[in-house]
Amino acid sequence: MISGHLQTPDSSDHSGDEAKLTKPSGLESKTNELWSSDLEEELESRIMQPATFSSILKQFPSISEETIISKIMSNKNCDKNNWKKKIYCYRYFLQPSKEEPDVGNMKSLVEKLEKLKLKKWSASEIEQLFCNYLEDLTTSAVKVSIPGKTLDEVAAAVNNIHPRPRWTRKEIECLIKNENDFKKLEKDLFVRDLDSIKKKIRRDNLSIQNEIQDSEKKSPQSTDSNNKDSSRDLSRKERDQLKKLLSKPICFSELLAKFPGHSWEYIAREIIQLDSSEDNTIWLKKIYYYCVVYSISVDKEITKYIGGGNRIYEKVRSDWSKIKTLDFFKDWSLQEFERLYCFAFHDLTKSALTKNFPSKNLNDICKVVNISFPKVPYTDREMKYLERHLDTPMQTLENNLPFRSRGSIHKKLEALKALTETTEQKQPPTKTRPKNEEEKNVENAAYMKELIMFDLTLEAIENTFPSEPIEEIIKEIKNSEIFDPLSFTRGEKELMAKLVKKGNLIDDCFDYFPLREEEFIRSKYAEAEYVSGRKMKFNTPEERLAYEAKWTLFNMGKQEYGRGNRRSTKRYCEIDELSKLEQEASVKRSKKKIELTEEELEQRRKRSEHFRLCRLKKLEEKREKYRIEKAKRLEKIAAGLIKPSTSGYELKDIVTSAEYFQSIVGDKQKVQEGQKRKRIQTEYFAPEFIEKPKAVKLKTTKRQAEKNKIKKQLKREAQLKIKKKKTIAPKKGKRRVKTNNGIIEEIKDVYKLSSEPYVESEVEEEDEEEDYISPYDPPDIISDSQVKLNGRHLYISSFYKELPEIPELKFVSLPHMEMSGNDITVAKQIMTTANDDILYDDCLAYEIVAQHIKSYRDLPISFPPVLDPITHELNSANIVRIRFFLYPEHYESFMLASPKSNELDPVHEIAKLFMIQYSLYFSHSDTLKKIITEDYCHKLEHSVEENDFGEFMFVVDKWNQLVMKLSPNLASVQNILGLKEDINEAPRAYLNQQEVSIPTNSDLKIETFYDEIMYESASPLFNPINSNLEIDSESAPIPLGEVEIPNNVIEEINEKMPDNYIPDFFRRLKEKTEVSRYAMQQILLRVYSRVVSTDSRKLRSYKAFTAETYGELLPSFTSEVLEKLNLLPTQKFYDLGSGVGNTTFQAALEFGACSSGGCEIMEHASKLTELQAGLIQKHLAVLGLQKLNLDFALHESFVGNEKVRASCLDCDVLIINNYLFDGQLNDEVGKLLYGLRPGTKIVSLRNFISPRYRATFDTVFDFLSVEKHEMSDIMSVSWTANKVPYYISTVEETIPREYLSREETKETSGKSKSVSPVGEIENVAAAMMTPPTDSSESEIIKN
């Protein structure tokens, strides 16, 4: 049977097999057969820890006691002498029936431990105390192992065993670890005083040093481990938190999340050192499983640093390789695998697995666990479940324990039942000598006196005398001389107050006070109820009267308890009667109305009228009397017989002011007679005005200036309308007589004079206010807004590796500016073609100015002219080149010129390039934002305004120098330095030698950039000092020749980049959770200005007011709408009628749509889309951003296009600019989108649903619910500057009832979108016609 059981694959639990060992001890051969190497390892790990013998037996409940003893004694690594003593202690206190021979003078120690029972120490606590006494007397270990006792009680017990206990191994380790920290040693070694600790250190100094040297020899990697763990040590609070977490069933990754400032190696080592559990290999396995699952390399040094376990690590690696071969491996996350591995140690019940892994199959869970644990030991939760369900049917147990077989559960149940029986039988009888009757009586009398003095509640009596009948104790207390039946003890008062606060009724309180009479308890309840709070609200006056009477009666007699029972009994009866009266009076009763006859009603009216007339008569008499007295008084005042009365307040004010003016210089001190007035110089206090530095504002762009102008015009018009409404006179039938104001207004109308001067002033005041800037249209980084990344990777994938790297790009040169056959320059053709070629010199901006030279004028006179004065050709000294941060070998060329109209502005483009690269790489720092805006953008614009070409070139050189200093692409920087090429030599040659300024490190503020980018500030001495520096001795003679100007040593030295700069730079990029909306929109506008703006005339050649008329949705429109829809990186986007692809590019770049597409039929617009797509991908590559996933259908109509239909049905958000769609084209859109998923959003410029719309059952419009919105800002579309409305349509599950007629409602009830009705319903095309639009939509379309 035994061998057959071992071969059963389901019974993988070795503890089920160990149930065989509960048989008699004569079967030692069978026991040896069942004893496995895993059990041997587990037992060895247990006995090497400070554990009691009873805890070892509980861990192996199915194995006999003799077997475990023999295994412990046969182990070579354990301290056999200590284990003999622990076994003796266990059998003496927990198995007193067995007699053991004396081991190492144990009888004397046991007699001392026996005395602890008198101090209410249990047998298990005594055994644990003895274990700590032998192996670990540190504070942390005692607190964990004996939680029911204080440290003072434990120290007293230890001193009772021996006044000078020997030093345990753990105490010596603590002493070695904290040799110089006496405060910590005194706290951690609570049994020892400070003198004994110091003596131990002095006496055993040599041995301690030897132990330290031995430990260093054994662990030569200690210095390496310190280098690995560069973080600070755990604080005391963090260490306590870590100890608490170790006892919880959590995995290693969850524990690491609680301590983010420390490395995993350091936390792992601390766990192994602090782990006081019986099996300390559990956390070691969790740590190595974490390393294997998350592909963290572990070498021999790390294993030694953590604490060993090479064999465990190799086993975990082999198990993980097997798990990877499972079919369902890809459906699980790494965190789920790690959590399941953790659950295998703590809880493998079905309820826990289904709760924590709801989406996983139980069979898959079993497969994963069985690979890592071929023999799964019973977890603590499984054991507790079996202990609680010993009598539960076997089928229920098998269902709730999926990893256990029927035989394994049966054996475990038998072992648990046998263990409970043996523990009940093995209760240790008291070995103390029996007490005399006199001693018992004296002890009981002391306890009883303490009860009578402090607490006579039922709970206190039962706790003090648990084994004696409660009736006898109550009789003895009542017969005691010191017992007072008419006074509550402190414990009884506190209990009564608690019962009253909880709201317990008085009848429920009698049982808590067994020594008190019922009447006395009632009085005390009333007293506590009164003390707790007086009643303030009453339903009726009678209830209030009864309550106050009871309260008065209670106060009158509460001190008369000792006068006799007759009076108190009468008072209590009165209180009860008043309580009943109060309860009856609290009920509101409505008064019965008395019905009166007509005669009685007439008499009542006469009486009320009579009383009213009498009151009026008396009031009139009083008024007449007051008039007469007032007239007489006024006559006397006029005759001078009575002085007018003065109020007391007026007199006080006069006296106070007189005293003030008599004071000395206003010090409120009255001048005495004969005192001279002091002459004190007057002090004048002027308020201090601190001028706040004005924030630097960048030059307003033409678009922003146009928006501000339009907003002001709209405000003026609104104010004029309000003014006109106020001046319009109301219509009246009679002829109105003209007033002076009316005549003045008529004159102003005739002579056309301005009648609203205040309106202009109001407008001027409003002009001075700051203009509102929309968050969806930021003009610069100062007023920028952020877009959430929502978990997407903004940069290329190589930036997110453990060792980030910058990929190489294929840069090509362009020797001459040439035109290709299709009127496109070679440079533009290279940059817009869909391949990997990128120009070293991106000269598209230069070509725009060169090809439209008539639209530009020269900058101020200090700047080079656009044309060479001699050759009248383009001036090469006017070309400025700007480098890129990630690829310094790539730069962009600009021809310096001022646009006459709305053309590309080179100066603004350079500033824009500065701000884009700040937003992408340094946006985490406001300090760097200030440097970029003030030192670069603002000074660039200021140099043009102030006609200073020298300052302009200084800013350009400073930027290029900064890129060379900060670029993480070290290979490119070295190549550039090797070539020694000056890309801006020609424009710099235009300046005089005195105007040329070379930027220094202080100009670049390079230290500030390092400090802001790096997580830890670089030391000012991170660079080595030049070796050629020499220091003269003090005694050396001073030469009398010419004194040379000393070099700036700091600028010569600080040329080296800090070591952690590049890793910290890429770490900043990885931790980005938001991206600049300004940067995203400007990247799109840069591409648009180089491709579409130069070739936009053909877009206006289409017929006006048709579906092919071209109109654009500007970036602010797309940003606001898509943010309102919350477009996520996991969603798809499509634009029906995408034009040149602007919205498609923006959805992919700004919001990270995983797929962004569009359909366009116009030839020229499709061609421009292809050029824009090629250029934007190359711009993103140079900036280090991810490529866009685009899906265009160009040169095609969406009508009847299955490819476009498939793309639309798969997307989550659609934009349709149907501003000029006719009814037939709208109908085609509905049929094309028929079948969209519920929840899909459609954005349109006009409503697809007309008034009184009826469902046709062949279009998506049947399922739309429409919401109307309006743009928050002006100039969001290309054809009007006003705020435009737009519509968001949501695809519903079913057809709304308002779209159906009564008959159709009956027929289609219960039908949803998935089952469209197919009936003989005519397709009413008129229902799909575009409805009448709002007034705001009726504007003339501007081409």
Swiss-Prot record:
It catalyses: L-lysyl(79)-[histone H3] + 3 S-adenosyl-L-methionine = N(6),N(6),N(6)-trimethyl-L-lysyl(79)-[histone H3] + 3 S-adenosyl-L-homocysteine + 3 H(+). Transmembrane segments: none annotated. GO terms for cellular component: chromosome, telomeric region; nucleus. It is found in: Nucleus. GO terms for biological process: DNA damage checkpoint signaling; DNA repair; methylation; subtelomeric heterochromatin formation. Residues 1-10, 420-430 have a biased composition (Polar residues). Keywords: Chromatin regulator, Methyltransferase, Nucleus, Repeat, S-adenosyl-L-methionine, Transcription, Transcription regulation, Transferase. Its EC number is 2.1.1.360. It comes from the Eukaryota. Residues 11-21, 226-236 have a biased composition (Basic and acidic residues). Histone methyltransferase that specifically trimethylates histone H3 to form H3K79me3. This methylation is required for telomere silencing and for the pachytene checkpoint during the meiotic cell cycle by allowing the recruitment of RAD9 to double strand breaks. Nucleosomes are preferred as substrate compared to free histone. This is Histone-lysine N-methyltransferase, H3 lysine-79 specific. The lineage of its organism: Eukaryota, Fungi, Dikarya, Ascomycota, Saccharomycotina.
